Structure formats: structure tokens, C-alpha cells
């Protein structure tokens, strides 16, 4: 009797599981795909003032991230990575997008209107279907793409995208945050250009990472020496938006000769309305990594605080000006002009 009762309960449980599965997939794949498309479009369109978009089309999380490793000076030219670009975008229900870009003062102030579409295959895809400022990055040099795959939101609620351009992880960075005022569409890009140009105008930028009196890293090499043999390197820094902060491990006893041994930390950069953002970041080690700097007078500064990551259920370090409520760590970084 107990045996039959057990079989009956097992059958009932199986039927319940089947009914549960049916309720999970109560809509067709076509309907679910359309719902995902509609949800992303509604989200993009519903931001009344538009979006601030940071796009690093090609990054390398391993390039110049080992401050104890010697750097052959023959590799300084031609070995730099690539930085990012700042856009503002406003999407409308009729599939139009108004865009500004940080390429120049003109593109920062002159809006360009193009068309976008949203489709669904394996991912929900945002496509910029007619020519826009973004397409200036869609080439072999920058390896950009006009088709963005929606990956969800980060712990701060920003929209995160990737492209099919790169198969390996951490090779690009696309982040969208809603603007907070009607003036943001114009002012954010203009300010990002101003901050980037201020950094690029530094004659001898140096980086210091410290915690109280303990210095983890401090660059001291004059990378941007204004000599004819340095012209190609100076052009590469500006064109690629990448900077390498160099520390001299062993100086040359012969005056005015290149040092015998150097090391450094490098990253691509982009100007923001608050200062600078570096990706893949100025990464001293797995823990001490600086991404977002705020401009303070003639310096760029960052202070790391600890916050709880609700997605990963662990703590992470972020810049204090983005999370003033975070726990103070005392880890700071400054970029200044040692001219």
C-alpha cells in the first residue's frame, strides 16, 4: 500500500513540475524576444535628458599593469593601447538618436541626428543604422562597432553593452548613464573635451599612488620631452588617448642618456564631465586599481572607498566622488604636471 501511495505522490509531483514549466514559458519565443526589444527601447527613450555614453572600443587589461616588470625602451613607441570616447545621446520613439561626441570642440557642440534600431537574436541588440559620430570608430584602427549587445546593468544601475567585435572578455567597455539635466546633452561632452585637453596639455604629467605616508607607485620620467626624436611618441599618445606613467628603476650614469631600466603603469583614458576615466584602469595590483578621477584645480585626483556590490555579493573599491557614502580606505592617486 505504501508503495502505491509513493508512486501516486511521485506522479503528482511530476505533473506539478510540468505545470510549473508551462507557466514559466507561457509566452512564445517570438513574444519574449519582442518584449525584450520593447523593454530596452522604452528604457532608452524614457530618459528625458538623454544619456552620457563612454565607449572604449579596444582595451587590454594586461598592458602595462605590472609596475615591477621592466619595460624595454624600444617598445615605448608603437606599443601603446587605445583610450575611449565620450558621447551624449538622446533617443526618441520614432527611432531617431541625437548625438554629440568628444572628437573636437565642433563635434561636442554640433548635434548630429541619425537612426537606430533594436532587434533580438541571442542578445537584445542596439544598432546605429545610419551614419553618425559613432561610425568614426568603426574601422580597423579603433575596432569599433555600430551594433551593441545589451548585457544588463552594473551595480550602479548603468546600462552595459558589448559587441561581437571581440571574443575575449575585457577587450571593450560601453557604459550608459542617464543625464540629470536638460543642459547635459551639450555641457557633458564639452566639459569632457575640456578635461581631456587639460590632461593632454600637461608638459610632464606624473602619477602618485599612496596610502598615508606609504607610496606604492610614483612616476618620475619625463615622457613628453619636446625633442624631434620624440615627435612620433607624442602623436601616438594624443591620437590613441593612452598614457604610460614611467618610473626610472636604474638611471644612466651618462648625463642626458636614456635610463638603463624603467617600469610603469599605463591605461587608455577619456575625458568626463568630472575629470578623467581610465580603462582598463591604472592597476597597481588586483586590489589597488584606479579608474575615475575628478579634476581639482590643475590636478586630477582619486580616492578609493569600499562599497558593497549587490550583484556579486562582495565588496569593491570605487572612487569616492562617485560613492561618497563608501568606507574610507585612505588609498589615493594624484596626477599633476611636474613641469
Spans of features found by a protein language model:
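Bacterial N-terminal signal peptides that target proteins for export
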Residues: 1-6
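C-terminal motif of bacterial Sec signal peptides marking the signal peptidase cleavage site
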Residues: 14-17
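Acidic/polar, low-complexity intrinsically disordered N-terminal segments immediately downstream
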Residues: 19-115, 123, 183-199
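Hydrophilic extracytoplasmic domains
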Residues: 23-50, 272-339
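Edge beta-strand at a domain terminus
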Residues: 23-30, 158-208, 306-339
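N-terminal glycine/threonine-rich, aromatic-flanked beta-hairpin/loop signature
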Residues: 68-123, 215-280
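A cross-kingdom feature marking solvent-exposed beta-strand/loop segments within repeated
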Residues: 129-146, 289
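Elongated scaffolding segments in large macromolecular assemblies
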Residues: 184-240
